[in-house]
Amino acid sequence: DTTEQFEHFDIIESEKTKGEIFISPDIAICDECKEEMFDPKDRRYLHPFINCTCCGPRLTILDALPYDRERTSMKEFPMCPDCAKEYTDEKTRRYDAQPVCCNQCGPQVYLIGRPERGRAAITYTRRLIREGKIVAIKGIGGFHLCCDATNEEVVCRLRTLKNRPAKPFAVMAKDESVVKRECVVTPEQEAILTGHQKPILLLDRRSDGGLASSVAPNNPKVGVMLPYAPVQLLIFSFLIATVSYTHLTLPT
């Protein structure tokens, strides 16, 4: 028997050395975190930055290698005792999850120029979108401009703001049922749409759908995606089913 016998297995901290290493891209919120976020009994109930070892920000929050919390933007948010316990316990789903946080120790959402913070800020944002306003929302990798994708007037206003007269906008739908209501979706397309990458998928529009025509003028197709960040899911709670989603960039 040539099998080596070992007496110990240790998980040690990273060392800062030169070399090539794979850093995971950001991963859309997993089903387990989604379930926790909407569980009133969970301590991360409605937490807009919930994550675990299976999902959440990775490359976007990294400042330097190796990938450890003190070299990410989360270094500004020390873990509370409960999060620290999960982080150091290899039996938990958040063992060694660098961005781990909760409502007590993690970042909080806020509105620029308004007093609302936390859940109140999300509630007010929902109200603005329902009222036909355009909102800049900071997600995992930057800002996006959002509005009600069924409101023709506000979508046209967004086109004027972006100086984009005809280029199609992407649409974020609340869930798969909304996508199927607005577009023709094959099983293969649904599998891609609901995967952990949450890509923008080009789909055929239904003639009886409710999207504003200005979302993709004179185009039988529309780019659709599902929410990938917790804050997006929270904004969709008790809200309209679709929003027009565009990067906050100036056209070249």
Predicted regions and their residues:
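Intrinsically disordered, low-complexity, mixed-charge
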Residues: 1-103, 107-110
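Conserved small/polar residues in nucleotide/adenosyl-binding loops
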Residues: 246-252
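Residue-level signal for inorganic ion chemistry
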Residues: 52, 102, 139, 158, ...
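A phosphate-binding glycine/aspartate-rich beta-alpha loop in the early core of alpha/beta enzymes
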Residues: 142-205
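Non-transmembrane, aqueous-exposed alpha-helical and coiled segments at domain scale
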Residues: 82-87, 98-99, 104-110, 121-122, ...
